[in-house]
Amino acid sequence: MHDITAKDKHVIIIGGGDTGSDCLGTSIRQGAKDVTVLQIMPKEPDERPDNQPWPTFARLYQKTSSMEEGGTYVYSTDSVNFVGSDEEQARVHIEDSTASEGFVADENGHVTGLKVVDVAPGENGPFTRQPGTERVLPADLVLISVGFLHPDTSTLLDQLPVELDKRGNVAR
């Protein structure tokens, strides 16, 4: 097994909670080229909204110490799949095991980007993908830090050899 480092890499962190914030700070301190944190939730307001009057707990935007170190947060965005330089279906090797063919990678099995799409609150579910918003973000290292809201297992996680617990979170 080899050490994983963010040094000189385009890093994408899927998940904007406490663990994602820790990944952001660590990636910056390790010398990443750039770091992008994907948050499926919309950005919280800077000021108390009318529908959350005092003394109700207000969900407000709070900048963490890791955010102050740098990086970019992208809100209301969901990950679709991993991509590579050749844009053909290929297999990605993860710690000597082979994942499903849902991945696209370069000739060496390395992920070079992540396809994402904007989302909005949905009528029949938590989020609806917005047509025409798909794009690819460059990525040499993708860190998955999801779990509090339960990861969507119909996209990226079904492509990985990842075990889920009874609640639908990534098992330890």
Predicted regions and their residues:
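Rossmann-like dinucleotide-binding cores of NAD(P)H-dependent redox enzymes
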Residues: 24-81, 90-100
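Beta1/beta-strand and adjacent pyrophosphate-binding region of the FAD-binding site
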Residues: 7-17
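N-terminal Rossmann-fold NAD(P) dinucleotide-binding loop
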Residues: 20
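Short, intrinsically disordered, charge-balanced linker/junction segments flanking boundaries
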Residues: 80-89, 163, 169-172
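FAD-site-proximal beta/loop scaffold in flavoenzymes
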Residues: 1-8, 103-106, 110, 122-172
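Redox-cofactor binding/interface segments in oxidoreductases and associated redox assembly factors
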Residues: 13, 116, 144
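Flexible glycine/proline-rich, aromatic-decorated loop/lid segments
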Residues: 41, 49-63, 112-116, 120, ...
